[in-house]
């Protein structure tokens, strides 16, 4: 079925490719005339195109000239001219598609033309990469093209100061990772002042390695969390003891493949007896189920010295891909606390979600979205259903010459790796470069030891030091090079036969102390000569490596996803170069062991000698079946994550939209008057629900009203004016009380001034929304945790989540209105009126208007938590958690924060010496 959908999605390919080809022809027709432009004239083209767009001309019409300008600018600044297929890829991106372009087709350069064209709108363009290194590298390199044409480029990196981030977003084109863009969106929606905002909208995004970011990493939502209120730590310790009494298979089941657990009837009874409760599954006990499941997972699925280590009384996560300790990272959803309880170490405070969004819903906010990858075809249906993105396969610049050999399968890992080493040794001896892909750090280090034992010089890369790895991968095509890498290592960098001239030139200029931004003119003048020298240096070696058969890619194991296998293969045979690929497999590989044990067992028990390789169709089918199972499971997980987040997303959009308008200075007076009317009418409706005036409880109604605002009219006055209780109508009661509330509100406004009242409204509503939204996220987490149990009652958990989530949202909105009204009427405030002040400057001084200052308890921006935890997808589809410590306790209020910074700076300055 999937293949049929993919075929249907691709029926428009020929038509789209014709359109893209026509664009390329139009750009080619302009090339000669653009070559005659001086540098200044080429730069002026940007202003001309921008003016035409402002006058109403569509970007589609400007595309040929804009792309021609970028092609010429790139030739002059980088010595790189866009091929026709790169122009076609760029046009596909501009039209909002995914451009499927094979490895080595120059995707980084492809992005420059559509980025430039869409930056002409002045609304900003975001180019999204898989790691900080690539974001910074691409921003520096391609920024030279943009600056040449009079545009600015920026780069968002982890741990940048907010002021720096704001400056980067203000650039015409901004590079960064998906996690950084997403977290900035969440932080902006936790801001208390518009001066804290860093992003300026979501106009157009180009996502590099789009399959990795929008597919592999989409199972894990972005979460910012802080220390939770209340003491839940005792439950972790309690359940760590409980699970020691439970037995696997008898009391609970464990699914190692899906990494899930399920408690059986016998286990439930034991837990209920231990805790002294009658029913674990009644609503009041719902949170306990999460503690129980985590305790079982900690016991069965998380192994000490494999998944984590204990150092200095602390549980530290071990990266499954690299084997390195991930300092400062913690498992989320209470899992880390459950492991701490199991190990008997100090249980650190659990976190509460402060803001969250899935990557799917973050990227769906962009007005236009596009992406590039070498391998999108297998997920074409998902790209269309989730993101409404079509996949366009762009032809290669030259025909592919790589030979993909059939898999070799061995009975066990030992003989497989022996064969791998023999193959590498033969290729190395004749000088052919070899790239070896492994699925884990453990395997790459094991192979490294075998190679060292045979005296084969090699490099080992483990997808952590991106800058070093990119440089090594770029040179992995040199003669006799042997590079062992985990599958994700160095991704996004081309392997060029004979070496990478561009990397060599960049390294040479860096050695001379030149920086593309700090010494831009000197750098630009030195670049052509440096690049030419580097090209000459690799040219001879390139020819030699071509004659040796090009790059040989050797996979030591099949990945869970066919795409990752194809990405590894795609490192070889770039730009029509010769190349070869082969996978060496064993029947004990994780994929076979977990997902197709039947086929593996039959072959294991066959009479074929251990050291003889099999080329079996049965094995190929088993591998395809296993990969299909994993891909199906992962797709289902992504779909499920999205379904639940869609419920929260509608609520998030409403709240964040309100917050943004308040921060940007919207007048809230009308909204507040609606709050007042709605809240008072709700109280009246409750009090007058039954009977007529003789039956209504006026005493209770007035008690409730007085908690809301200082009522200046009595119940007796209104009853008397109506002519008695029996003649009093609900409408008359509402009219009188609303009139009274308006008069009281007007009097309060007159006492503090209209401008100050508007500021008070803004601060109060913002404060209440922030607090209530965090409480609501906690409620939604709590609801989601126990919603799966509804299936036991033959109810659809998603439908129940939608229904109850909507009820919770309505309750929250009602509470926001009621609390805001109460604060606005009753809060004691201290007001500094608005004033005009003279500020000295070079011209002698100018007048600035200072907004009124309103101070009251609860209206200051809350202190940022001492620790914020950032949970996000890791490169490759896992989960990573980073803990950010705010040791200074810097205020979230800009004015207060500035005072703190000034005090801190003053404390650092040495005291002036007194003159004698």
UniProtKB/Swiss-Prot annotation:
Phosphoprotein found in the keyword field: no
GO biological process: intracellular protein transmembrane transport; protein import; protein targeting; protein transport by the Sec complex
Keywords noted in UniProt: ATP-binding, Cell membrane, Cytoplasm, Membrane, Nucleotide-binding, Protein transport, Translocase, Translocation, Transport
Entry GO CC: cell envelope Sec protein transport complex; cytosol; plasma membrane
Major localization class: membrane
Residues given in the record as ATP binding sites: 86, 104-108, 494
Compartment annotation: Cell membrane; Cytoplasm
Composition skew (Basic and acidic residues), residue ranges: 898-908
Membrane topology, as annotated: Peripheral membrane protein
Enzyme Commission number: 7.4.2.8
Stored Pfam families: P-loop_SecA, SecA_DEAD, SecA_PP_bind, SecA_SW
Keyword match Transmembrane helix: no
Catalytic activity: ATP + H2O + cellular proteinSide 1 = ADP + phosphate + cellular proteinSide 2
GO molecular function per UniProt: ATP binding; protein-exporting ATPase activity
Similarity annotation: Belongs to the SecA family.
Function summary: Part of the Sec protein translocase complex. Interacts with the SecYEG preprotein conducting channel. Has a central role in coupling the hydrolysis of ATP to the transfer of proteins into and across the cell membrane, serving as an ATP-driven molecular motor driving the stepwise translocation of polypeptide chains across the membrane.
Protein name from the UniProt record: Protein translocase subunit SecA
């Amino acid at each position: 079925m999937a293949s049929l959908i993919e075929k249907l999605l691709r029926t428009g390919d020929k038509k789209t490719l014709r359109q893209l080809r026509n664009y390329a022809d139009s750009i080619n027709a302009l090339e000669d005339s653009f070559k005659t432009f001086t540098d200044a004239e080429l730069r002026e083209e940007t202003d001309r195109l921008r003016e035409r767009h402002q006058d109403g001309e569509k970007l589609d019409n400007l595309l040929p000239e804009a792309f021609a300008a970028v092609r010429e600018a790139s030739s002059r600044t980088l010595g790189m001219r866009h091929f026709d297929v790169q122009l076609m890829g760029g046009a596909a991106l501009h039209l909002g598609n995914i451009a499927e372009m094979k490895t080595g087709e120059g995707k980084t350069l492809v992005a420059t033309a559509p980025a430039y064209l869409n930056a002409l709108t002045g609304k900003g363009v975001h180019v999204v990469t898989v790691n900080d290194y690539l974001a910074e590298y691409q921003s520096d390199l391609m920024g030279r093209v943009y600056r040449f044409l009079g545009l600015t480029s920026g780069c968002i990196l982890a741990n940048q100061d907010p002021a720096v981030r704001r400056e980067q977003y203000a650039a015409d084109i901004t590079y960064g990772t998906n996690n950084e863009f997403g977290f900035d969106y969440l932080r902006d929606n936790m801001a208390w002042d518009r001066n804290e905002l860093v992003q300026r909208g979501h106009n157009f995004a180009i996502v590099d390695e789009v399959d990795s970011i929008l597919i592999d990493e989409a199972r894990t939502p972005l979460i910012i969390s802080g220390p939770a209120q209340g003491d839940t730590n005792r439950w972790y310790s309690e359940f760590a003891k409980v699970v020691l009494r439970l037995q696997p298979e008898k009391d609970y089941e464990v699914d190692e493949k899906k990494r899930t657990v399920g408690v059986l009837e016998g286990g439930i009874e034991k837990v209920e007896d231990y805790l002294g409760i009658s029913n674990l599954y009644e609503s009041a006990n719902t949170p306990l189920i999460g503690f129980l499941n985590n305790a079982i997972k900690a016991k069965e699925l998380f192994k000490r010295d494999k998944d984590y280590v204990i150092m200095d009384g602390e549980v530290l996560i071990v990266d499954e891909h690299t084997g390195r300790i991930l300092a400062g990272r913690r498992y989320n959803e209470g899992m880390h606390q459950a492991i701490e309880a199991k190990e008997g170490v100090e249980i650190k405070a659990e976190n509460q979600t402060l803001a969250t969004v899935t990557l799917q819903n973050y990227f769906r906010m962009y007005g236009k979205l596009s992406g590039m990858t070498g391998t999108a075809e297998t997920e074409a249906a998902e790209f269309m259903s989730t993101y409404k993105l079509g996949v366009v396969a762009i032809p290669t610049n030259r025909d592919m010459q790589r030979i993909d050999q059939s898999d070799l399968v061995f009975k066990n890992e030992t003989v497989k790796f022996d064969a791998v080493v023999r193959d590498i040794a033969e290729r190395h001896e004749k000088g052919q470069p070899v790239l070896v892909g492994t699925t884990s750090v453990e395997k790459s280090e094991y192979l490294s030891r075998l190679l060292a034992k045979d005296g084969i010089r090699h490099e080992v890369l483990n997808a952590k030091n991106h800058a070093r790895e990119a440089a090594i991968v770029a040179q992995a095509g040199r003669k006799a090079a042997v590079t062992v890498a985990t599958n994700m290592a160095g991704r996004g960098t081309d392997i060029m036969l004979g070496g990478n001239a561009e990397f060599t030139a960049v390294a040479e200029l860096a050695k001379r102390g030149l920086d593309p931004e700090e010494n831009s003119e000197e750098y630009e003048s030195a670049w052509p000569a440096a690049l030419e020298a580097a090209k000459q240096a690799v040219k001879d070696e390139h020819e030699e490596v071509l004659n040796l058969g090009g790059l040989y890619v050797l996979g030591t194991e099949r990945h869970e996803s066919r795409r990752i296998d194809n990405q590894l293969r795609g490192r070889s045979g770039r730009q029509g170069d010769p190349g070869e690929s082969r996978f060496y497999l064993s029947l004990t590989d994780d994929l076979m062991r977990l997902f197709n044990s039947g086929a593996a067992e039959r072959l294991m028990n066959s009479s074929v000698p251990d050291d003889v390789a099999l080329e079996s169709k049965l094995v190929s089918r088993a591998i395809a079946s296993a990969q299909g199972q994993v891909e199906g499971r992962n797709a289902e997980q992504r779909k499920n994550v999205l379904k639940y987040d869609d419920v929260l997303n509608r609520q998030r959009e409403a709240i964040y939209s309100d917050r943004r308008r308040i921060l940007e200075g919207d007048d809230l007076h009308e909204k507040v008057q609606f709050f007042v009317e709605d809240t008072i009418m709700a109280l009246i409706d409750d009090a007058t629900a039954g009977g007529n005036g003789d039956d209504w409880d006026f005493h209770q109604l007035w008690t409730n009203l007085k908690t809301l605002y200082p009522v200046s009219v009595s119940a007796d006055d209104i009853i008397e004016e109506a002519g008695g209780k029996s003649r009093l109508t609900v409408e008359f009661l509402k009219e009188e009380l609303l009139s009274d509330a308006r008069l009281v509100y007007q009097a309060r406004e007159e006492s503090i001034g209209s401008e100050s009242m508007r500021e008070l409204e803004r601060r109060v509503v913002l404060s209440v929304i922030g607090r209530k939204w965090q409480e609501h996220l906690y409620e939604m987490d709590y609801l989601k945790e126990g919603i799966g149990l509804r299936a036991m009652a033959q109810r659809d958990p998603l439908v129940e989540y939608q229904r109850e989530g909507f009820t919770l949202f309505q309750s929250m909105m009602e509470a926001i209105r009621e609390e805001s009204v109460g604060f606005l009427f009753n809060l004691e405030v201290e007001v500094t009126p608005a004033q005009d002040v003279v500020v000295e400057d070079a011209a002698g001084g100018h007048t600035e208007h200072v907004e009124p200052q309103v101070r009251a308890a609860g209206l200051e921006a809350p202190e940022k938590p001492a620790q914020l935890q950032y949970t996000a997808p890791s490169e490759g589809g896992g989960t990573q958690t980073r803990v950010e410590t705010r040791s200074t306790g810097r205020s979230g209020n800009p004015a207060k924060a500035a005072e703190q910074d000034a005090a801190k700076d003053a404390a650092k300055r040495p005291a002036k010496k007194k003159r004698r």
